């Protein structure tokens, strides 16, 4: 399966690799195709610079070790995608749709009420229960 994850999933997995989220990301990388968009990587860099400035080198090594497919879609017409409360989340949703991801994993509640068939939008715990047991 093609699985795209949001920024917070990667941050949690990077900071806490033995956590459930860390184990889920490791499972995805081993058993599926992890898909990341350039928007997510840029957001990761910004978050680490602001919140974890002393761990930037660790972050860079962590991301370099991940096996993933990078997509860099220049999406300009956000109006054609389902609406979402936080407009900053539209690039992730749009990239997930355009990359034909099977699953989008996020803990962001803004994605809870989006009604689309593909990708299936699930929380990390749902991924663990459904695919890791």
Where are the regions that the model predicts?
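Domain-scale selection of a single, long terminal region
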Residues: 42-76, 92
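PIN/NYN-family metal-dependent endoribonuclease catalytic core
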Residues: 5, 15, 21-50
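Alpha-helix capping/helix-boundary segments
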Residues: 9-10, 40, 92, 110-111, ...
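Active-site neighborhoods of divalent-metal-dependent phosphate/nucleic-acid chemistry enzymes
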Residues: 69-103, 109
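Residues that mark the start of a beta-strand
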Residues: 1-2
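Acidic, PIN/NYN-like endoribonuclease modules and their adjacent C-terminal/linker elements
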Residues: 82, 109-133
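A secondary-structure boundary/capping signal
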Residues: 6-7, 37, 107, 124
């Amino acid at each position: 399966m093609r699985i795209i994850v949001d920024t917070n999933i990667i941050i949690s997995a990077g900071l806490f690799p033995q956590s459930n989220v860390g184990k889920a990301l490791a499972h995805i990388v081993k058993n599926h195709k992890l898909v990341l968009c350039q928007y997510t990587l840029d957001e990761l860099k910004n978050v680490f610079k602001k919140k974890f400035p002393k761990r930037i080198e660790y972050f860079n090594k962590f991301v370099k070790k991940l096996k993933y497919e990078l997509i860099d879609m220049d999406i300009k017409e956000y109006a054609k995608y389902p609406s979402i409360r936080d407009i900053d989340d539209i690039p992730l949703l749009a990239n997930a749709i355009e990359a034909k991801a099977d699953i989008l994993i996020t803990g962001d509640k803004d994605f809870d009420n989006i009604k689309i068939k593909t990708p299936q939008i699930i929380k990390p715990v749902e991924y663990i229960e459904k695919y890791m047991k």
